[in-house]
């Protein structure tokens, strides 16, 4: 979001949000060449090799079982909102346990979705008015949520924000006041770390009574 911050007053009408490895990993060159000149909000994602698994019917015309992931259309990936990735040791979390907590921190009264509709890799074509619906401070604060460390890799919060980008760019929900105020945000964010620690210390554990008796906890 640094580009949004640095060029907030003179953003181009349409922006492509890309990754260096997008072509070949998240979409084909053929797909990108067909859509790169779009002037509307576009998911830059296209993996036809998964159509057979994620569509309603497979190549044998048999109905697929509904799983935790599927395609809403050819370039819109949908994933059950279970934040399965947050316990990865390669992407540790500091502020938010899951997408639900993140949405509640950003918005005053968010609708918590059962599924997240997003573009894997966070690659989109987005319009200026979608970006400017939020303040410059809003994007600075989002950066603080997901760019605080690379130990050993980017944090879990980056995965979480990847999944809510369509919400950020399209939702009409009102954001919390601290999202538009850097000082208030920096005063509020440590509460999230304390909450993470509390939930970890009070997480359900097997054989808790036995462990306590043995002096292990």
Spans of features found by a protein language model:
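ER/Golgi luminal nucleotide-sugar-dependent glycosyltransferases, focusing on the catalytic module
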Residues: 1-217
């Amino acid at each position: 979001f640094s580009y949004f911050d640095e060029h907030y007053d003179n953003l181009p009408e349409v922006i492509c949000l890309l990754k260096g490895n997008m072509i070949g990993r998240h979409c084909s060159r053929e797909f990108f060449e067909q859509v790169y000149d779009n002037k509307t909000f576009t998911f830059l994602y296209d993996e036809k090799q998964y159509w057979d698994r994620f569509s309603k019917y497979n190549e044998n015309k048999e109905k697929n079982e509904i799983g935790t992931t599927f395609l809403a259309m050819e370039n819109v990936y949908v994933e059950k909102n279970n934040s399965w990735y947050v316990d990865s040791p390669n992407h540790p979390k500091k502020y938010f346990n899951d997408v639900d907590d993140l949405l509640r921190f950003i918005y005053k009264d968010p609708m918590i979705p059962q599924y997240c509709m997003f573009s894997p890799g966070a690659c989109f074509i987005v319009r200026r008015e979608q970006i400017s619906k939020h303040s410059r401070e809003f994007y600075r604060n989002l950066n603080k949520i997901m760019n605080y460390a690379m130990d050993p890799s980017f944090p879990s919060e980056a995965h979480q924000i990847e999944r809510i980008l369509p919400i950020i760019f399209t939702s009409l929900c009102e954001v919390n006041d601290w999202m538009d105020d850097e000082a208030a945000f920096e005063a509020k964010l440590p509460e999230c770390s304390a909450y993470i620690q509390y939930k970890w210390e009070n997480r359900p554990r097997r054989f808790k009574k036995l462990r306590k008796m043995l002096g292990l906890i």
